[in-house]
């Protein structure tokens, strides 16, 4: 009888282990405001799931390191891999590594360059960047009454989101309603608050005149705000817009410093990436592109988004 009971217990343990799912995730860099929200959302969601082990690694903004992490996940025999790419132009190699190993791969937040040719059992979860810069720039155009001068602060140039958001800006400013707005400067600050502040300081020192700051994310917009305040510029004299609707950005909006942001649902993207990875690991079909909607944030609807990111 004792042997029979032990046998049943062992079978239960084996069955439980067989159904456990291990997901390896390589994030572009931990030291990033939105990336931290995304990572925390993934970790919190994974904790609510029975039998799911989420292992997250920091790629430290190093493409070679990220590829090595993917190779290590493959060698460890994980059931699925999630990647927030360091360089969206380097994803073809990552896709091949996972496809050759027969392991599902989900890209999150940053669109891979090979999005239209992803192998089977691979997907992309994010928000549609056609909407992000478009929502942002249309609102800024409205606040400027369709005329004035603007400076543009771009994210990392190797990143598809930065390129797309910047294209959105140009597309909106080319419309009849907004073609009276001239871009007088356009440079990168690599998504970073400190670099955004440094860039704005340089523009102010050079005597660049502008009526609006259009930044590819909130962190760079906040950096620009800090530099403007340090230079004694009134926040009422300039329209400033970012993207992400982070807690810091919404605090700046409540203080009358930031005028426009666009909510990017970090928690929703994280949850969606894990759900897609689990479905693919079980042989279930998912859409190649899974979009979590962007939403415009202004002072009028600020309260709806506080505490979401």
From Swiss-Prot:
A Pfam family hit: Peripla_BP_4
A Gene Ontology molecular function term of the record: carbohydrate binding
Compartments it resides in: Periplasm
Keywords associated with the record: Periplasm, Signal, Transport
Signal peptide range in chain numbering: 1-20
CC per GO annotation: periplasmic space
Purpose: Involved in rhizopine (L-3-O-methyl-scyllo-inosamine) catabolism. Could be involved in its high affinity transport.
Family named by the database record: Belongs to the bacterial solute-binding protein 2 family.
Protein name per UniProt: Putative rhizopine-binding protein
The gene coding this protein: mocB
């Amino acid at each position: 009888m004792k042997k029979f009971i032990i046998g049943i217990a062992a079978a239960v343990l084996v069955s439980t282990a067989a159904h456990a799912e291990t997901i390896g995730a390589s994030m572009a860099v931990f030291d990033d405001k939105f990336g931290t929200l995304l990572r925390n959302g993934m970790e919190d969601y994974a904790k609510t799931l029975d039998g799911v082990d989420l292992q997250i690694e920091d790629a430290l903004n190093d493409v070679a390191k990220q590829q090595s992490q993917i190779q290590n996940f493959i060698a460890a025999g994980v059931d699925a891999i999630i990647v927030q790419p360091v360089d969206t132009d380097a994803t073809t190699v990552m896709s091949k590594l996972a496809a050759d190993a027969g392991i599902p791969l989900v890209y999150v937040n940053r669109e891979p360059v090979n999005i239209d040719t992803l192998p089977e059992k691979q997907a992309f979860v994010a928000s549609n960047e056609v909407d992000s810069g478009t929502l942002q720039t249309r609102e800024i155009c409205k606040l400027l009454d369709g005329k004035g001068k603007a400076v543009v602060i771009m994210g990392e140039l190797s990143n598809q989101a930065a390129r797309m958001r910047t294209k959105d800006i140009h597309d909106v400013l080319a419309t009849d309603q907004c073609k009276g707005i001239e871009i007088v400067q356009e440079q990168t600050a690599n998504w970073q608050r400190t670099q955004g502040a440094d860039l704005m300081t340089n523009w102010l020192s050079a005597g660049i005149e502008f009526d609006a700051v259009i930044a590819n994310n909130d962190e760079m917009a906040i950096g620009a705000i800090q530099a403007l305040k340090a230079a004694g510029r009134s926040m009422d004299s300039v329209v400033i817009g970012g993207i992400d609707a982070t807690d810091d950005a919404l605090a700046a909006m409540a203080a009358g410093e930031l005028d426009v942001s666009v909510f990017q649902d970090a928690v929703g993207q994280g949850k969606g990436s894990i759900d897609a990875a689990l479905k693919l690991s079980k042989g279930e079909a998912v859409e190649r592109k899974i979009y979590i909607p962007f939403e415009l944030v202004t002072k009028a609807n600020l309260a709806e988004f506080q505490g979401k990111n």
